[in-house]
Amino acid sequence: MRLLILTGFILTLLYACRSTKVIQKAIEKKDTVAVVVPVDVPTHDDTVKLIAAIFDGYKAIEYKTFAAKIKVDYFNSKGKQPDFVANVRMRKDSIIWVSISNDLGIEGFRVLIDKDSIRVMDKLANTYQVKPLTSMQDIVQIPFSLSSIQELLVGNPVFFNRDSVIAYTKTEKGYTLLSSGELFKNLLSFNNGFAFEKSKLDDKDLMRNRTADLSYFEYESKTGVMFSTYREMFLSHQNKLDIQLKFKDYKFNEALSYPFNVPKKFKRIQ
């Protein structure tokens, strides 16, 4: 299927959203020497103060527009799959534009996502599709939004509610917060400088055995924004998927265009 590469990229992001949205509330630490303190024990006041300090120290990325070139490598149960480059442009709460090409720079697909729909041009087959965003929601089985995908791409924690924190840990390496949603647990880890390092998502239904590990590395601040330029996603449900994202040429708050002109010769398909 010609849309396999495109679907793999977008569904990778959406699956992570899924495990984050339903999970939206957890952040935990693997360090075995850490002391976990439930929020509702006698140290509640100290817990509240620590959680507040973490959120005061952590600065979510604020932006109006964002653009980046992303090198995508991924592995599934059959081994390494063909890598590709995704050029992404976004206007917050409005639009996501993606151009997918191979290492030689030959564009294969172009995608436009807004609050209601997803449009896909297959430049290899001279076809295009227009589908409601809800069709993607059905595939990943969560009511995600445009803004959820944007937050995931820019590197902010998604679907996390500080009011749902049930435990925390403090170690020499940093902090973790654990929250629990209806279907998932979400574990967020921060270093001592309050940089967001990891989100670990676990399905509360052990029969589904659904997990996701999202890790953030190689922070830099070339644009005045602390930004993770290398990320790893390990997804496990019925199959396992390992995705590596390398961000290059990223920029914030610059004027962007979102060209999506369908040639007359392209055939619309369902």
What spans do the regions from the language model cover?
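C-terminal motif of bacterial Sec signal peptides marking the signal peptidase cleavage site
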Residues: 13-16
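Coil residues (strongly favoring Ser/Thr
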Residues: 31-32, 47, 94, 117, ...
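Post-signal peptide N-terminal segment of secreted/secretory-pathway proteins
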Residues: 68-110, 116-117
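Edge/loop elements at the starts and ends of beta-strands within beta-rich repeat scaffolds
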Residues: 58-66, 77-82, 89-94, 170, ...
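Positively charged n-region of N-terminal signal peptides that target proteins for export
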Residues: 1-5
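Gly/Pro-enriched, hydrophobic low-complexity segments
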Residues: 19-26, 166-270
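An acidic-aromatic
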Residues: 95-146
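N-terminal leader/targeting segments and the immediate start of mature chains
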Residues: 18-71, 75-81, 267-270
